[in-house]
Design a protein with these regions (language model features):
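The feature marks long extracellular or luminal low-complexity segments
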Residues: 1-157
Length: 157
C-alpha cells in the first residue's frame, strides 16, 4: 500500500515499491522529539527520536562562586564550568580541564555531570590576583579564564 508523508516544512515523502519512505531529520534542539507518519485514510504511527548535543561545536563557560576570599587554605571558591554546543544545548559527559596560578585545585580534570556542570574547589595561601582557567579536553587551545582576588585574613583585636 502506498502512503504519503507530510513533513513539517510542507514537503512530502512517498513510499517506494517496498513500502518504505526515507526522510532526513534535522534539528537544533537536543532531546526527545516525536515523529508521526500518517497514511491516507487516517492510520498513523509515532516514533520518538533523540537528538543529542553537538560535541563538535561544544564550548565552555566558567563561573566563580566567590572571587574575593581569604588566602589561608581554608577560604575557598567553587569554579563551575558549563558546556553547551553551538545551539545552546547542554553537553553532558565531556571532560573539562582546569588550571590555576598559585592556587590549589581539588581536581584538574572533571567530566560534566547530568546537570552539565563540572565543578572544582580552589584554595590558596598566597594573597593577590590569581588566574584560573578552564578548557575542553579535546580543545585545549580554547581557554576561558577568570581572575580571583585572594586577600589576607584580617587580624581581630
Amino acid at each position: 500500500m502506498k502512503a504519503n508523508f507530510t513533513l513539517s516544512d510542507g514537503d512530502k515523502a512517498v513510499t517506494d515499491a517496498d513500502g518504505k519512505a526515507k526522510v532526513t531529520l534535522k534539528g537544533t534542539k537536543a532531546g526527545a522529539h516525536t515523529v508521526t507518519a500518517s497514511m491516507v485514510g487516517g492510520k498513523s504511527e509515532q516514533l520518538v527520536v533523540n537528538f543529542t548535543a553537538d560535541t563538535l561545536t561544544a564550548q565552555v563557560n566558567l563561573n566563580v562562586t566567590e572571587d574575593n576570599f581569604i588566602a589561608n587554605n581554608i577560604g575557598m571558591t567553587r569554579l563551575q564550568a558549563t558546556v553547551t554546543d553551538g545551539n545552546g544545548n547542554p553537553v553532558e559527559g565531556i571532560k573539562v580541564n582546569f588550571r590555576g596560578t598559585s592556587v590549589t585545585l581539588s581536581s584538574t580534570s572533571v567530566e560534566t555531570d547530568d546537570q552539565v556542570f563540572a565543578e572544582i574547589l580552589v584554595t590558596s595561601t598566597e594573597v593577590g590576583l590569581k588566574t584560573v582557567s578552564a578548557s575542553l579536553a579535546d580543545k585545549p587551545t580554547e581557554v576561558i579564564s577568570r581572575l580571583l582576588m585572594l586577600k589576607a585574613k584580617r587580624k581581630s583585636r
